[in-house]
Amino acid sequence: MRTRAVILRLLAGVTLVVAGLVAGSVASIAGAAQQVTADDGATVISQTMVAPRTLDLTIQSPALGRTAMTRILLPPDWDARPSARWPVLYLLHGCCDDYTSWTRQTDVAALTGGTDVLVVMPEAGPDGYYSNWLSGPAWETFHTVELRQLLERGYRAGQRRAIAGLSMGGLGAFDYSARHPGMFQAAASYGGALDTTLSQEAIDQVTSVVSSNGHDPNALWGDPAKQPLVWAAHNPLDLAFALRGTKLFVAAGNGQPGPLDPPGTGFNESEALHGAETSALVDRLRLLHIPATVDLYGPGTHSWPYWQRELHASFPMLMAAIGVTPMV
């Protein structure tokens, strides 16, 4: 109980007040970047239509101290309904990838081609872990404050949101849902890092990802032995109690080669670890009597064919939670 109380106090420090919407959202997206700013001065400095419905935004972010990219897929009725506000689906990338990964590796553009939802795929750094670092970038502020406000003020994003992510992005989806109650109506994790302190191996995976990208691993959440409460405040399993009321979907394999792997594929340690972390979170949710849709599908590696399959499997639930009927 003491740990939960301390975590709640830590969360209180990042509780966000949802900003009011401003008038004057645009009807046509082509052309110059929209002249809107977030409360802290973050702004879209350029936008590029890179494919049908696909818009890349370059954002000057005070939270990060640099520019960052976000890719959005516009709803198919964007132009036909110039005053509409759109439900939002955030898709979070994994370690060592970027904001282009979902459109590059999956059929998400086709999947959402008949569905009136704004799909948002933000940059999170190769090792950002969807967190405000103790010493470094403030990714959580960038995503949940700056980007959210810019989308609401310039790109007609509404107040109903779902979020999903793979690997490191699975941690982000569940962390953001737990740390900002009510911001997201549904969350999904595919092979997610859902218990970063499950074992020394789990801790080492986080610190090795950070150090392999040239950063001090203690700059993220501190020394895990000396600052366990900071780690707990960013660990989905420790935050599970705050997920009550959010529609949840969790999926992972066990690292053994499965039906979507090519011949000769070997055992995958990353998915084995993330499968164990996912199982631990599922056990915690059951202990707390928090419902979730669970797909612990056994053989399967830490790879895109499984993540795309689970995106399809979770898509109807994610859309239903934000009041959208998907076209299939």
Identify the role of each PLM range.
Residues 1-17, 156:
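N-terminal export and membrane-targeting signals
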Residues 9-10, 24-328:
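Non-catalytic cap/lid and distal C-terminal segments of serine-dependent acyl enzymes
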